[in-house]
């Protein structure tokens, strides 16, 4: 096969690299610091910060092949030619560099001269007011008869706020084979859904800024954002009927065929056998969904009940139901996962080595789903009424139990039931609206032209503590440039600074300046962040500055040292996890401040504390070895030769000078943060916490320095002392004589409990005290049962004594007695005095209540209602309720006397 998917991808990247673009690796499917998206769903989604000017791109020309996931049209997957959940998006991007004419030229050149597509089959859409784009296509030989001018709905990309602009789309005519009704060009010009005219490329010209009120202004930095779905392009180049008939899909479908009696027919597109189409759809659903499942689990999202985890669960369950249609032997699962990782792993390196993790997670969910199907079928059978199924039940089967709509319809048809499918669709639509955050839209922030245009150079000095600096930029709180500020809040930029700006998970430096030009005013900074052109913006709440002012700039040396300790410690923790637990563990988020460091990572199971202590011990060894820090400046190729760890959320130019931080052979990472000069300065480390951040995602919190650890130990000892005192109080309140021996032994153990003097003893002491706490609580429970028994006997004797009176009722008042206990005791006494009515008042949990047991309960209720407002409920011989007012016992007794 001439054009494989790998070749199509590489041709794209090679072409744009030759045109001066930096080819970026595919990012994780899980968005980084972007709560607006559940998954990365387009090639540009990972580049939002560059387009909004929050971050400076490593190159003004970028290209990528990005793995994407969309699940808003999941019901269509398997039944159309091109709908998929997981797909690759090819893209080229210009950030303040080339614009319309060059972007169109690249697209035309690549498609015609490199992919060798016939330009006579090109059909183009342009925005109706975009004459430049229309004329540019004419220059490339596309006749006006194959260019359509469209309105805003079709050819203007606008999210209502922020960067926006017109777009142009390239369609390719696949010929009459894909036009069975011979409709012709009308399909394209009237935008009718079809398989003949296929969109292969969309180019967005981001040239305006929408202020949110429909007012448009020219962007300071005009951008190009393009996208071409690789599966569509491959289908055209391979002359495949659908995306599912291309090389990678056919390889996966071949594995399915080996485990079932059905066969996939690549020519079925041109046939009309509905029964065969059901089997075809099953092949497509399984192959598509298993690709998505493999990628998501490999990135640490395991099937589960919430958010991303629920999407993975739903995909797997839909695939498993498709397996049932083929009577597919589930032994296909392991070779399917192996094949997916094999065909994609060379480019998408996050898959490498994840075979077993993915397979184990799938099999665990398969077992769980067997039970779920049975529960769903039980719900289905139980919910049938009057030969109908309620829409809410159909939706519940779909949403909660993972039954596809087609399966529900099969169940309904077999039982000849009536269902209001329109109501079901309305419920599904409501659910889709709630889940809209995963739809195919992006929310770019408003581009700030003042920050973009501010390009005066500023330098960060890593090692200096105090410097003289000059004010080169001044902005108010709305980022508007100003000449001066007087006792106001705002942002100041200096020609050089010693204050680190928040980035790479490291918090900004604490610091201040002395402004000689403003009567030596001291101004403290409450934040430092990087602007789009890499200058450090210093935020202040109250200060006076003027452009050109000279200041003394100082950072807090103690703060900086603690941050350096913790940042270097985070690197060592990352390396220790890889060395001691699993070499495939990768940091997936980190935070470093003066107080602590944290690291997030994905792993298939929880680590034990024994494993964490092994990691801790390894780090301490590295600290004790006092390894010198090496700071190496090299290019991307040089850093790769050093095996330096880089992260998906960072992009690095081939020609950019990169900073590598190395501690011997133990840790080598690309990093722009501040670090200790040698590991001995970290002094010590201690893991303070470890917990789940979601399914398969974990966080470790760790501290450093003897002073910080001593303070932490002192704090924990305070908590241990509080626990010891609390346990002593519990033991002192135990009254059961039978427990005296155990009580004495536990009291002795608590008296001899020694608080840890060194941090390495803390966990052992915490575990020991926790065991004592469990034992004391068990004793407390036994004592409570004994006290309840004693109380029950006391109440019983009191009621028996009252029952001897020559009255039709027994009236008694109690305080703080468990209503359940009171009811049980009263019932036992009632069994001996069946002709009595028991009226029991009780003040429990500060709530006055009453209880009636025995004969004439209903008669008594009517009598009481005539005198009091009350509420409650019960049966013929039992009532429990409360009065809406305080009740005088003597008055109540007088009323009850009338029952005689």
From Swiss-Prot:
Pfam families: tRNA-synt_2c, tRNA_SAD. Zn(2+) binds at residues 567, 571, 671, 675. Its cofactor is Zn(2+). Binds 1 zinc ion per subunit. GO terms for cellular component: cytosol. The keyword Cytoplasm applies. GO terms for molecular function: alanine-tRNA ligase activity; aminoacyl-tRNA deacylase activity; ATP binding; tRNA binding; zinc ion binding. Its EC number is 6.1.1.7. It comes from the Bacteria. The keyword DNA damage does not apply. It catalyses: tRNA(Ala) + L-alanine + ATP = L-alanyl-tRNA(Ala) + AMP + diphosphate. It is found in: Cytoplasm. Keywords: Aminoacyl-tRNA synthetase, ATP-binding, Cytoplasm, Ligase, Metal-binding, Nucleotide-binding, Protein biosynthesis, RNA-binding, tRNA-binding, Zinc. Disulfide bonds: none annotated. Catalyzes the attachment of alanine to tRNA(Ala) in a two-step reaction: alanine is first activated by ATP to form Ala-AMP and then transferred to the acceptor end of tRNA(Ala). Also edits incorrectly charged Ser-tRNA(Ala) and Gly-tRNA(Ala) via its editing domain. NCBIfam families: alaS. PANTHER family: ALANINE--TRNA LIGASE, CYTOPLASMIC, ALANYL-TRNA SYNTHETASE. Belongs to the class-II aminoacyl-tRNA synthetase family. Consists of three domains; the N-terminal catalytic domain, the editing domain and the C-terminal C-Ala domain. The editing domain removes incorrectly charged amino acids, while the C-Ala domain, along with tRNA(Ala), serves as a bridge to cooperatively bring together the editing and aminoacylation centers thus stimulating deacylation of misacylated tRNAs. This is Alanine--tRNA ligase. The lineage of its organism: Bacteria, Bacillati, Mycoplasmatota, Mycoplasmoidales, Mycoplasmoidaceae.
């Amino acid at each position: 096969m001439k054009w494989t998917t790998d070749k199509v991808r590489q041709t794209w990247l090679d072409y744009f690299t030759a045109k001066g673009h930096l080819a970026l690796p595919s990012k994780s499917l899980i968005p980084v610091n972007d709560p607006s998206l559940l998954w990365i769903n387009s090639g540009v989604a990972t580049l939002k910060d560059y387009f909004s000017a929050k971050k400076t791109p490593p190159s003004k020309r970028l290209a990528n092949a990005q793995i994407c996931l969309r699940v808003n049209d999941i019901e269509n997957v398997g039944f159309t030619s091109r709908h998929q959940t997981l797909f690759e998006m090819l893209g080229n991007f210009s950030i303040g560099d080339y614009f319309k004419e060059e972007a169109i030229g690249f697209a035309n050149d690549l498609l015609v001269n490199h992919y060798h597509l016939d330009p006579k089959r090109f059909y183009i859409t342009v925005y109706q007011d975009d004459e430049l784009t229309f004329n540019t296509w004419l220059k490339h030989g596309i006749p006006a008869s194959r260019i359509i001018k469209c309105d805003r709905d079709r050819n203007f990309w606008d999210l209502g706020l922020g960067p926006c602009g017109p777009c142009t789309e390239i369609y390719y005519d696949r010929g009459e084979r894909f036009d069975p009704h011979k409709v012709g060009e009308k399909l394209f010009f009237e935008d009718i859904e079809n398989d003949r005219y296929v969109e292969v490329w969309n180019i967005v010209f981001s040239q305006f800024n929408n202020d949110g009120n429909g007012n448009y202004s020219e962007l300071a930095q005009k951008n190009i954002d393009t996208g071409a779905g690789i599966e569509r392009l491959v289908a055209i180049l391979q002359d495949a009927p659908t995306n599912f008939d291309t090389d990678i899909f056919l390889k996966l479908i071949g594995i399915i065929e080996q485990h079932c009696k059905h066969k996939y027919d690549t020519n079925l597109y041109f046939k009309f056998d509905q029964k065969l189409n059901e089997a075809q759809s099953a092949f497509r659903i399984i192959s598509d969904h298993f690709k998505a499942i493999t990628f998501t689990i490999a990135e640490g999202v395991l099937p589960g009940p919430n958010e991303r985890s629920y999407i993975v669960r739903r995909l797997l369950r839909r695939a498993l139901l498709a397996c049932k249609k083929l009577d597919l032997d589930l032994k296909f699962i392991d070779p399917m996962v192996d094949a997916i990782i094999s065909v994609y792993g060379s480019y998408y390196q996050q898959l490498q080595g994840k075979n077993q993790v993915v397979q184990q997670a799938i099999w665990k969910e398969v077992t769980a789903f067997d039970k779920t199907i049975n529960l769903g079928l039980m719900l289905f059978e139980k919910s049938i009424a009057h030969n109908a199924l309620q829409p809410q039940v159909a939706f519940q089967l779909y949403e909660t139990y993972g039954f596809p709509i087609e399966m529900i319809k099969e169940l309904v048809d077999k039982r000849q039931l009536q269902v209001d499918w329109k109501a079901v669709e309305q419920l599904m639509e409501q659910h889709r609206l709630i889940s809209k955050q995963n739809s195919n839209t992006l929310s770019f922030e408003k581009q700030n032209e003042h920050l973009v245009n501010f390009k005066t150079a500023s330098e960060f000095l890593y090692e200096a503590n105090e410097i003289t600096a000059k004010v080169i930029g001044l902005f108010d709180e709305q980022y508007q440039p100003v000449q001066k500020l007087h006792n106001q809040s705002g942002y100041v930029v200096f020609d050089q600074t010693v204050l680190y700006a928040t980035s790479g998970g490291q918090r900004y430096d604490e610091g201040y300046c002395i402004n000689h030009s403003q009567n030596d005013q001291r101004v403290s900074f409450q934040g430092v962040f990087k602007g789009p052109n890499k200058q450090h913006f210093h935020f202040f709440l109250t200060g006076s500055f003027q452009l050109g002012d000279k200041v003394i700039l100082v950072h807090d040396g103690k703060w900086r040292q603690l941050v350096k300790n913790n940042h270097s410690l985070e690197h060592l923790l990352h390396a220790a996890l890889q060395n001691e637990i699993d070499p495939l563990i990768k940091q997936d988020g980190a935070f470093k401040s003066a107080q602590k460091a944290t690291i997030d990572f994905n792993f298939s199971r929880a680590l034990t504390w024994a494993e964490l202590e092994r990691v801790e011990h390894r780090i301490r060894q590295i600290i004790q070895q006092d390894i010198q820090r090496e700071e190496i400046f090299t290019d991307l190729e040089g850093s790769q030769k050093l095996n330096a760890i880089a992260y998906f959320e960072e992009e690095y130019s081939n020609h950019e000078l990169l900073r590598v931080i190395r501690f011997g052979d133990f840790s080598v990472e690309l990093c722009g943060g501040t670090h200790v000069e040698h590991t001995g300065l970290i002094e010590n480390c201690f893991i303070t916490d470890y917990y789940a951040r979601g399914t398969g995602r974990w966080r470790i919190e760790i501290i450093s320095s003897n002073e910080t650890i001593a303070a932490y130990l002192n704090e924990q000892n305070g908590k241990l002392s509080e626990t010891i005192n609390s346990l002593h109080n519990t033991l002192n309140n135990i009254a059961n004589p039978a427990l005296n021996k155990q009580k004495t032994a536990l009291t002795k153990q608590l008296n001899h409990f020694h608080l840890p003097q060194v941090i390495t003893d803390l966990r052992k002491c915490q575990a020991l005290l926790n065991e004592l706490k469990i034992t004391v609580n068990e004793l407390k429970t036994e004592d409570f049962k004994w006290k309840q028994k004693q109380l029950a006997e006391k109440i019983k004797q009191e009621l028996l004594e009252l029952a001897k009176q020559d009255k039709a009722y027994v009236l008694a008042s109690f305080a703080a007695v468990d209503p359940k206990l009171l009811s049980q005791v009263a019932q036992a006494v009632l069994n001996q005095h069946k002709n009595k009515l028991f009226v029991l008042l009780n003040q429990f949990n500060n709530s006055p209540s009453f209880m009636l047991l025995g004969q004439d309960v209903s008669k008594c209720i009517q009598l009481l209602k005539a005198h009091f407002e009350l509420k409650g409920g019960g049966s013929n011989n039992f009532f429990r309720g409360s009065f809406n007012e305080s009740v005088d016992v003597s008055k109540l007794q007088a009323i009850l006397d009338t029952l005689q």
